[in-house]
């Protein structure tokens, strides 16, 4: 129990069960406080967090049980593959065998020479994707509806091949070697961000290694209504010019991120 000032106290309860009703009452000496009831939030399992499920349609890979990352009810994750395969092979693909951590893993590859847009970082995210050739920046939409408990951490396994910056973007401007990026963001039902956490990989890691980061809440009162988890082989590959047409982030052609078991 923690005392704040002279009259305020707080206590942390551990070992509570998900989605369960509880009653609590404070005892001090021989005095009993009022009984208060509360319900713990329900833990929700997100689909395909082990990246075992993939579907291929032509050159395009989808991290879903259907060849869709837009409006099919079975689609939950998305990639930018539909846009990339206009010019190249899919930049986000499943891998197996010695290239995987367990079963299948996701591999993301950065192209530093894409016609018109300039560059394309491999990505994998909870959300939707619909190619907008006129404004590529608006093609992805990050996040899907979420009504589960407030997560406190995100962990998983990754390895990374960081390449020297070859695409002469202006953001951040002084980057010498590429960086990978994994983050989680939560919004409330008003669309306001309430929590965020991230992992940034700055060097080559040749063997699968565990990553873990805390999720920090800027608002602990509002309940989460939307969640996004995003992974990319180039942290600045999603930075576009003011018209949303051309990448201005610095990336390294050939940078590759592998992830598994979120």
Question: Regions from the language model: what does each represent?
Answer:
Residues 23-27, 228-230:
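Extracellular recognition modules
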Residues 189-240, 252:
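Extracellular carbohydrate recognition and processing domains
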Residues 235-262:
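Extracellular carbohydrate recognition
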Residues 13-20:
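Surface-exposed, short loops/turns at beta-strand junctions within beta-sandwich domains
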Residues 96-115:
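Short carbohydrate-recognition loop motifs
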Residues 42-43, 151, 160-204:
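Extracellular ligand-binding interfaces
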Residues 35-89:
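Extracellular carbohydrate-recognition regions
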Residues 52-53, 109-113, 144-163, 170-174:
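Solvent-exposed strand-to-loop "edge" motifs in beta-rich extracellular domains
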